[in-house]
């Protein structure tokens, strides 16, 4: 199995560290391998985003650009990435449907709920299949669908 590429977008250092600790625990307990990137604001991930991630773990309330706005912009470029919101703001839960978020977790984040949603996310990534590959470009990496390759 290949590594699952996860991006954590969280502006609170303690919350970010908890998510990273949970990801490490999940890897150890379930034999998974993750490649994890971290951004501390929605604007930063939108600015640098290329469709190479499998799962986005997004906070909503952040200073420059909130996670919901970031998710909308990311969806314009990547319709495959699995989005999970992790936030203290329950009032935005319905808005998550606009960006086809898989789930919405509330802080304080309990391990069991996190692990269950992460399992669902990984299952969705694998179920959707990955008929793509990462290639290096002049601007970094991008995901190329194998069906789009006409000639080598």
How would you label these PLM feature ranges?
Residues 10-12, 88:
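Acidic di-acidic motifs
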Residues 113-152:
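Conserved binding/recognition cores within well-folded domains
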Residues 4, 34, 81:
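Switch/coupling loops of ABC transporter nucleotide-binding domains
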Residues 35-55:
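Acidic, metal-coordinating helix/loop segments flanking the phosphotransfer/catalytic sites
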Residues 1-7:
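Non-catalytic signal-transmission and effector/linker regions of two-component phosphorelay proteins
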Residues 12-37, 76:
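Two-component/phosphorelay signaling modules centered on CheY-like receiver
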Residues 47, 53-127:
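CheY-like receiver
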């Amino acid at each position: 199995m290949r590594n699952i590429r996860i991006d954590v977008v969280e502006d609170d250092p303690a919350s970010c560290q908890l998510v990273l600790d949970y990801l490490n625990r999940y890897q150890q307990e379930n034999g998974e391998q993750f490649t994890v990137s971290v951004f501390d604001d929605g604007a930063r991930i939108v600015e640098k985003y290329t469709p190479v991630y499998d799962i986005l773990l997004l906070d909503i309330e952040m200073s420059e650009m909130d996670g919901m706005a970031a998710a909308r912009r990311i969806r314009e470029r990547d319709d495959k990435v699995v989005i999970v919101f992790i936030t203290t703001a329950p009032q935005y839960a319905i808005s998550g449907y606009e960006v086809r978020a898989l789930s919405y977790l509330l802080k304080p984040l309990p391990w069991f709920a996190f692990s269950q949603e992460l399992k669902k996310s990984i299952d969705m990534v694998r179920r959707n299949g990955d008929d793509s590959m990462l290639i290096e470009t002049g601007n970094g990496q991008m995901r190329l669908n194998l069906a789009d390759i006409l000639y080598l």
